Amino acid sequence: MKEIPMRDFDFIVSPAKLLTPEIVQMVSSIHEHKGKQELFLEANVDELKTLLEVALIQSTGASNRIEGIFTSDKRLEELVSQKAEPRNLSEQEIAGYREVLSTIYEGYEYINPRPNIILQLHWDLYSYSQGAAGGSYKNSDNVIAETDAEGHQKARFIPVPAFQTDEAMEELCARFLEAWEADRIDKLVLIPMFILDFLCIHPFNDGNVPLRYQQQIAA
């Protein structure tokens, strides 16, 4: 059988190629506004609390809709605010997303992108869903496909095979943390690179997109 090559997770050379003048300007602008953030936080505590509640609801709704999971706006707000129990499979997945999002908001400073942490978050994501394989990597190969106007499907890209997923996730997390701790590359460049590599691995049968959103929030 032909050997399938592993992906190369490069957080040293590749970032330099991404630093176009436009990206450098955007990164600099983000850092500049972050420096002004503390004064705004101190002066607008109540307003920011309201904005956070709205953001939690909108993030939960948007991420789940991408996965084909829907409920009414009223039920969504009740589920995210923990004022209601899930009634069906869709609402169970929404409740799981809420739990992971709460974990990240409350402890993001202590959450590192390590395989065991990512597996735990995935388990929490499906903690309300009976029979779901939360906390385990995919057990079969998956293909990201697209359908044209005539209904024909073709592969958009082929993720890492199931048998290489564990090794790929270990390598991805190790290389990312090395670059993060070395602090030679701007973290605003490293984060989207990690997210893209994570999606290219597509390590789970389900739940890859919600976890991608939550990793962005944690970062």
Which ranges hold each PLM region?
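FIC/Doc superfamily catalytic core
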Residues: 1-219
